[in-house]
C-alpha cells in the first residue's frame, strides 16, 4: 500500500494542533467573603473578642437547641451587639440536659420541671405546648375503613 507523502505531512501537522480547546477551571466557592464583611462590620463597632466562652446554646421555640461546641464570641457593649461565630448543631433538649443543668438559673426551674414530666410521661418534649390539644379532633383510622366513613 503506497503512502502519499502530502497526506502524511498534513496528518502530522494536524496532530500537532491542540484538540478540544482550553480547559475552563471550576470556580471555588469561598465563604470568606461573608466572614470578611462580618469582621469589617464588627471592626467598625470596635468589638472585642471574649475568650472565656467554650460553648453556646440557643434555645428555639420548637424545643430544639442550636449548640455551638467551639464558638467565637465578639462583643461591642456600647452598641449592644454580640456576634457568635462557629458551626452550630441542631440538637434535642434531652440530649443536652446533663450539660445544660449547671448553666441554667432559678428562672428556668419551671421549664425543667415541665420537661421532666414530659419525659416521665413518655412524650417527646416540646417547649411551646400550644399544640397539645390539636390532635383531639382527628379521628383514628381502623384498617379496612375509608377516611370519609370515620366520624
Curated annotation (Swiss-Prot):
Q: List the InterPro entries hit by this protein, alphabetically.
A: BTF3, NAC_A/B_dom_sf, Nas_poly-pep-assoc_cplx_dom
**Keyword Protein biosynthesis attached:** no
> Would you tell me the Gene Ontology cellular component terms?
cytoplasm; nucleus
Q: Which residues form the NAC-A/B domain?
A: 32-97
Q: Which domain of life is it from?
A: Eukaryota
Q: Where found in the cell?
A: Cytoplasm; Nucleus
Query: Gene3D superfamilies from the xrefs?
Result: Nascent polypeptide-associated complex domain
Note down the stretches annotated as region Disordered: 122-151
Entry's Gene Ontology BP terms: protein transport
Q: Which UniProt keywords apply?
A: Cytoplasm, Nucleus, Protein transport, Repressor, Transcription, Transcription regulation, Transport
Q: How does it assemble?
A: Part of the nascent polypeptide-associated complex (NAC), consisting of EGD2 and EGD1. NAC associates with ribosomes via EGD1.
Q: What does this protein do?
A: Component of the nascent polypeptide-associated complex (NAC), a dynamic component of the ribosomal exit tunnel, protecting the emerging polypeptides from interaction with other cytoplasmic proteins to ensure appropriate nascent protein targeting. The NAC complex also promotes mitochondrial protein import by enhancing productive ribosome interactions with the outer mitochondrial membrane and blocks the inappropriate interaction of ribosomes translating non-secretory nascent polypeptides with translocation sites in the membrane of the endoplasmic reticulum.
**Which family does the UniProt entry place this protein in?**
Belongs to the NAC-beta family.
Protein name as it appears in the record: Nascent polypeptide-associated complex subunit beta
- The organism is Meyerozyma guilliermondii (strain ATCC 6260 / CBS 566 / DSM 6381 / JCM 1539 / NBRC 10279 / NRRL Y-324)
Highest lineage ranks of the organism? Eukaryota, Fungi, Dikarya, Ascomycota, Saccharomycotina
Amino acid at each position: 500500500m503506497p503512502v502519499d507523502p502530502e497526506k502524511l505531512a498534513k496528518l502530522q501537522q494536524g496532530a500537532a494542533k491542540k484538540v478540544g480547546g482550553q480547559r475552563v477551571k471550576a470556580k471555588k466557592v469561598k465563604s470568606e467573603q461573608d466572614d470578611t464583611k462580618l469582621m469589617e462590620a464588627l471592626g467598625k463597632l470596635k468589638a472585642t473578642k471574649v475568650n472565656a466562652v467554650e460553648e453556646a446554646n440557643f434555645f428555639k421555640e420548637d424545643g430544639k437547641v442550636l449548640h455551638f461546641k467551639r464558638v467565637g464570641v465578639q462583643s461591642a457593649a456600647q452598641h449592644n451587639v454580640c456576634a457568635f461565630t462557629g458551626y452550630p448543631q441542631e440538637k434535642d433538649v434531652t440530649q443536652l440536659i446533663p450539660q445544660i443543668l449547671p448553666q441554667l438559673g432559678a428562672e428556668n426551674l419551671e421549664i425543667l420541671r415541665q420537661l421532666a414530666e414530659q419525659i416521665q410521661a413518655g412524650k417527646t418534649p416540646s417547649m411551646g405546648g400550644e399544640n397539645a390539644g390539636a390532635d383531639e379532633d382527628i379521628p383514628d383510622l381502623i384498617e379496612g375503613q375509608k377516611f370519609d366513613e370515620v366520624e
